[in-house]
Amino acid sequence: MQTQRLRIAIQKKGRLSKECQDLLKRCGVKFNMMGERLVVHSENMPIDLLLVRDDDIPGLIMDGVVDLGVIGENELEEVGLERAARNEPSDYKKLRRLDFGDCRLSIAIDKDATYNGPQDLQGKRIATTYPQLVKRYMDKQGVTFSTCMLNGSVEVAPRAGLADAICDLVSTGATLEANGLKEAAVILRSKAVLIQCTAELSAEKQALIDRLLTRMQGVIQAKESKYIMLHAPTDRLEQIKMLLPGAEDPTVLPLSQNNNRVAVHLVSTENLFWETMEQLKELGASSILVLPIEKMME
């Protein structure tokens, strides 16, 4: 089914849903998420959002049902391996990593057990929701094992006698600790990514995707940057500039009725820590302001 409206699949509920919606809104895409609708139409752009389960998104992209999707790399790679094993289409274009959805897929074992490496898992039973990723990792390590497939509450498997170890997503490790487990090995580090189907799109759709990518770059870069303003003595200007990690050279402006000091403005692409601000003050800087940036375009 061909449509001139850009179709974007996003997670209906879960850890990526809200941040994905926030990103699209900051990119200027207006939509109303009220109700339990599965398809939401943008109010100001030819864009439709499809709200689906996260594990459905890769297949929708790979089958060409939707144009774009936002998905965690862990789910994307798991589904891709699964489809490839069934000789189903598994191609996609990865447009960019996003600035949310950070997690890692890790093997965890009993907190009192000793772990010397993957060979310790030889012949063991591993509970996981990601059997394909675990198999890929174990095959590379030359380790044979058996899988206990679970779709939830993976961390209780060892205590219930279902498995010797688990492989699951970890953010802080608190859930592992609460269940008497410890992280033994990271097999994948994951973030949310924006992906595109491999089908040839109309010029209008591709132009809209390019616009969205430019806006996403601006939103993400703005989130990671700060606008810094300060007054600096002219005789220490070069020393002060060396302390400021800028995206470009700073703007230096004269101050009215003061020839010995200037105003310095710049966009910093790195965090300005308290220690740096204290160093700036020691060099004679004053009126130091660090401000958030809402949008950027280079």
Swiss-Prot record:
Its predominant location is cytoplasm
**An example Gene Ontology CC term for this record:** cytoplasm
The cross-references to Pfam families, in alphabetical order and at most eight, read: HisG, HisG_C
Record keywords: Protein biosynthesis included? no
Q: Transferase as a keyword?
A: yes
Top-level taxon = Bacteria
How is the protein's activity regulated, according to its record? Feedback inhibited by histidine.
Q: Kindly state which keywords UniProt assigns to this record, in alphabetical order.
A: Amino-acid biosynthesis, ATP-binding, Cytoplasm, Glycosyltransferase, Histidine biosynthesis, Magnesium, Metal-binding, Nucleotide-binding, Transferase
Q: What is its EC number?
A: 2.4.2.17
UniProt pathway annotation: Amino-acid biosynthesis; L-histidine biosynthesis; L-histidine from 5-phospho-alpha-D-ribose 1-diphosphate: step 1/9
- Reaction catalysed? 1-(5-phospho-beta-D-ribosyl)-ATP + diphosphate = 5-phospho-alpha-D-ribose 1-diphosphate + ATP
| The protein's required cofactors | Mg(2+)
> By its UniProt entry, which InterPro entries does this protein fall under?
ATP-PRT_HisG_long, ATP_PRibTrfase_cat, ATP_PRibTrfase_CS, ATP_PRibTrfase_HisG, HisG_C, N-reg_PII-like_a/b, N-reg_PII/ATP_PRibTrfase_C
Q: Where in the cell is it found?
A: Cytoplasm
Output the GO biological process annotations, alphabetical, semicolon-separated. Answer: L-histidine biosynthetic process
Molecular function in Gene Ontology: ATP binding; ATP phosphoribosyltransferase activity; magnesium ion binding
Function summary = Catalyzes the condensation of ATP and 5-phosphoribose 1-diphosphate to form N'-(5'-phosphoribosyl)-ATP (PR-ATP). Has a crucial role in the pathway because the rate of histidine biosynthesis seems to be controlled primarily by regulation of HisG enzymatic activity.
Q: Which family does it belong to?
A: Belongs to the ATP phosphoribosyltransferase family. Long subfamily.
Q: What is this protein called?
A: ATP phosphoribosyltransferase
